[in-house]
Amino acid sequence: DAMLHGIDGIDLVSFRVLGGALLFWIASFFTKREHIPTKDIIKMAGAGIFGLVCNQCCYTIGLSLTSPSNSSIMTTSMPIFAMILSFLILKEPITWKKAIGVLMGCSGACIIILTSATAGNAKVGNIWGDLLCISAQLSFALYLALFKPLVQKYSLFTVNKWMFTWATLFIWPFTIGHVSDIPFAQVPMSTWWETGYVIFFGTFLGYICMMIGQKTLRPTVVSVYNYVQPLVSVTVSVIVGLAVFKGMQAIAAILIFSGVWLVVKSKSKNDIDKHDHSLAYEKRHA
């Protein structure tokens, strides 16, 4: 709602990265201080580029060009990218269970999105907007696959404060002129509260929870929970009386939860390595 009352997408991205940087720096003062070599601080710049700058900017600009339903459908590509990149970068196997789970989740999410589209949101799609939205998903999938070792090495507050700091340094030189044009006096107080909600809950707490998962879960598992977002959106809309739950959406919910379960239960590289070592041990002692 904030984006309809004086704060557009680029402004919101700018506030999110700056607000996130400030909150994570404040939080870091209450956690154990960690020594970070210069090379890792530079790596965190890369994490900020892929996990925040490209992801947020590409999606925000893409959303302004294409339709909401198209942009939502594009987000279903992220677990597919994460699965492929995890195979190429982290050597995580693409098992049948994992592949079927990702496709089931993707199908369920698409059903939710398409059955939730209304004539009031019938903006025409745009190929460049769609490509930007896909680029945003590829960017975040790269972040999940490339920077998992970095996330596991340091505390989530250390990683996030540097990621958001770098993102602020990359984004604000290009957006400060746009932000300064906001008619601050005309923006309703409710809009500032909504922006604050996005910064604190959607960004600060959101990245804390995401990184806790990233530390312990495989990139494909982290990304597949992306399919739950449209289901949560529809459920909340039904609860507040803005939508009606449809039969096809119930089927979609089953597909999403089944897909997530299959991906979570699929074997990781460590599982397969342990199994191979166990077989080798049994053969040696047979």
Give residue spans per PLM region.
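Transmembrane alpha-helices of multi-pass small-molecule transport proteins
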Residues: L4-C54, F81, S139-L146, K161-S180, ...
